């Protein structure tokens, strides 16, 4: 999951932000995470997290340089139709928060569930 977040940070979202800003109504290709599974399979989690953190810092700095009006820039999305940069930024946050929830569930399952013994029986995991 960390490799996916790292890859999405640089090769999907940042690329799209740049296209929103530099092109007039760019057309985006569908993003298919399945086609990158091999790339993620053997990734080192610490390296992926470090790469993600570096890219996130760079992306936040870049986003802060954009004028507020950039949020109204438009693009064409293959499934959603015409979208604004502002909408994509909200989707980016939802994407990341969804994966953070999954990571938290995996930590809960692997580190705490068994150690809780019978007290853990009433918990349902949703990774």
What are these regions (language model features)?
Residues 1-31, 60, 74-127:
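Short, contiguous alpha-helical
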Residues 34-73, 87-92, 100-102:
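Acidic/histidine-rich alpha-helical segments that form the ligand environment
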